[in-house]
Regions:
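Juxtamembrane intracellular "pre-TM" segments in multi-pass secondary transporters
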Residues: 138-169, 193
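Pair of pore-lining "gating" transmembrane helices in MFS-fold secondary transporters
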Residues: 53, 160-182
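Helix-to-loop junctions at the C-terminal end of transmembrane segments
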Residues: 1-11, 105, 215-231
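C-terminal ends and interior cores of transmembrane alpha-helices
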Residues: 18-42, 239-256
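C-terminal transmembrane helical hairpin of 12-TM major facilitator-type secondary transporters
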Residues: 232-279
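Transmembrane alpha-helices of Major Facilitator/SLC transporters
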Residues: 201-226, 242-245
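Glycine-rich segments within core transmembrane alpha-helices of 12-TM secondary carriers
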Residues: 80-105, 208
Length: 297
């Protein structure tokens, strides 16, 4: 719904900033719920659910508005590069934030965590406001649009009636579920089966993100710099490679003494990155292939 409103209003910046504010509220509420668990578990659980709902809403409002901004103002031939740069910055931000916050948290205490979350969220809101200031004033739309006003339900029906869009939406839902599934099991798996220490399992996650970084970079250079391969083919290759990597990681547990877990995890990250950046590029191309103003939907 928020994405549709930014479609109608044409003000992506406002929704990017508003999404970050809502995300910050959710993150701070989640941190404040931690000490509440020792006083009232039920209240803490309910507030935690609310906090993560706010986090999801904030990420959706800010993230989809940013992607729609890219789709609206980026030429077709540059969309793979735009998606690559955006996701590379995201991966870099995750790694940088985790490193800095991890050092600031030592020695750990709930009070220290709450202060760090508050400071970090205030900083991100400030940076978002600065970098998006007047950013849309000097931009031109790649395509002109004639559809300025329509109901959300009507817009959704029109988009969903497109069989290509419907198939792609279902595909993204299933593939992203698989994409994030490994986050729940990979680190415990490495500790229980391969006897990794917490520090080693954390490094394993960093290795995977390094693979993601290189996979994204490779697809961006191949598609934009060398005009090699269509985005849909890169999406398929990334999915198949990720599937094979997960199977090999599972089989490696049968011989944990000799199995090369770290290279396999790096390979999983590489194919994850290949899939992710190609899927985002395909999504932006699909969103702007018509002349109507429905990139956010």
């Amino acid at each position: 719904k928020w994405g549709f409103i930014s479609d109608v209003q044409g003000n992506r910046t406002k929704w990017i900033i508003l999404g970050m504010i809502i995300l910050a509220l959710g993150a701070n509420l989640a941190a404040l719920c931690i000490p509440l668990y020792s006083l009232n578990t039920t209240a803490a659980t309910l507030l935690s659910i609310l906090a993560y709902v706010l986090i999801g809403l904030g990420v959706g409002a800010s993230g989809t508005s940013l992607l729609a901004l890219l789709a609206t103002h980026t030429a077709q031939r540059r969309r793979a590069a735009a998606a690559t740069i955006t996701w590379l910055m995201m991966i870099f931000g995750i790694a940088l934030t985790a490193t800095i916050v991890g050092k600031l948290l030592d020695p750990y205490s709930v009070q220290r965590l709450i202060k760090i979350v508050f400071g970090l969220t205030m900083l991100t809101i400030l940076l978002t406001g600065v970098v998006t200031l007047n950013i849309e004033r000097g931009l031109e739309r790649v395509k002109k649009n004639t559809n300025q006003s329509q109901s959300f339900i009507l817009g959704l029906k029109i988009i969903w009636s497109n069989s290509q869009t419907k198939r792609f939406t279902i595909f993204v839902f299933l593939s992203m579920t698989a994409y994030f599934m490994q986050e729940l099991i990979l680190e415990p798996y490495s500790g229980l089966v391969f006897s990794f220490t917490p520090g080693q399992s954390t490094s394993l996650s960093g290795m995977q993100n390094g693979g993601v970084f290189l996979g994204m970079l490779a697809v961006g250079i191949a598609c934009t710099g060398f005009k090699f391969g269509a985005l849909k083919n890169w999406v398929s290759a990334g999915c198949m490679g990720s599937c094979i990597s997960l199977i090999l990681i599972a089989l490696a547990g049968q011989s944990p003494e000799i199995a090369p877990l770290v290279p396999l995890v790096f390979g999983l990250g590489f194919f994850n990155g290949m899939f992710a950046v190609a899927a985002i590029g395909s999504m932006m191309s699909l969103a702007s292939q018509n002349n109507d103003k429905r990139e956010e939907i």
